[in-house]
Amino acid sequence: MLQLKLFAVLLTCLLLLGQVNSSPVPEVSSAKRSRRMTPFWRGVSLRPIGASCRDDSECITRLCRKRRCSLSVAQE
């Protein structure tokens, strides 16, 4: 009976040791930050004409001039 208990304890220790060794390794985060919005949400969230912008991709007309969404390429 003592041998059976000793075998059970040894087997349990081996199983627990295997679980510790197979635990996942944390991933290293990349230095470059990726865009968070999917293409669907980028399309839905485009800014109207006259809204403030930083980039052509933010405007519904794809024209950001003088930090405002523009309708035409050349403004007076």
Swiss-Prot record:
InterPro entries in the cross-refs: LEAP-2
Source domain of life: Eukaryota
Organism: Mus musculus (Mouse)
GO biological process: defense response to bacterium
The gene coding this protein: Leap2
Signal peptide: 1-22
Principal location listed in the UniProt entry: secreted
Entries under Pfam families matching the protein: LEAP-2 (PF07359)
The protein's name: Liver-expressed antimicrobial peptide 2
Record's keyword terms, sorted: Antibiotic, Antimicrobial, Cleavage on pair of basic residues, Disulfide bond, Secreted, Signal
